[in-house]
């Protein structure tokens, strides 16, 4: 097993750990989930570049008669990238004392102000950071508003 294979195994394990954390562990942290809202995906250009580069590496490894283990590991890496970028849906998860946004826990008392832009983006101003929350379904903004009013 080469260093390349070990690095591929490390990256696959990291992506798998992230996927498991995102799907199964994060919704169970910090109490029961009050509301889970699907968000719009950010630009897919990065994901296309990543999966395309891995596909080029697979092609190069196959045509140069490289190790089969490396080909399988590259294929697994491409599948993990495909899952994370195209199948998994980003979510905002509201709990009793705060919410998870982009896998970061934010307590409600950190919100200094909230605004709704004309194009349906909820803007939350924190102490030093601004969150731009783009929901997939515009009706979910009303659910978020009701939940925040109930918990404040």
Curated annotation (Swiss-Prot):
GO terms for cellular component: plasma membrane. It is a multi-pass membrane protein. Keywords: Cell inner membrane, Cell membrane, Membrane, Transmembrane, Transmembrane helix. Pfam families: DUF986. It is found in: Cell inner membrane. Belongs to the UPF0266 family. This is UPF0266 membrane protein YobD. It comes from Salmonella paratyphi C (strain RKS4594).
């Amino acid at each position: 097993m080469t260093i390349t294979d070990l690095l591929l195994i490390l990256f696959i394990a990291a992506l798998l750990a992230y996927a498991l954390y995102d799907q199964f562990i994060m919704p169970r942290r910090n109490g029961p989930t009050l509301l889970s809202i699907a968000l719009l995906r950010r630009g897919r250009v990065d994901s296309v570049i990543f999966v395309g580069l891995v596909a080029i590496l697979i092609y190069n490894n196959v045509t140069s008669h490289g190790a089969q283990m490396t080909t399988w590991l590259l294929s697994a890496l491409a599948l993990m990238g495909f899952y994370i970028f195209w199948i998994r849906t980003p979510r905002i998860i509201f709990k009793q004392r705060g919410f998870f946004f982009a896998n970061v826990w934010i307590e409600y008392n950190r919100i200094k102000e909230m605004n709704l832009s004309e194009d349906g983006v909820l803007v939350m101003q924190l102490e030093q950071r601004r969150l731009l929350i783009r929901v997939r379904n515009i009706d979910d903004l009303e659910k978020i508003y009701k939940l925040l009013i109930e918990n404040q």
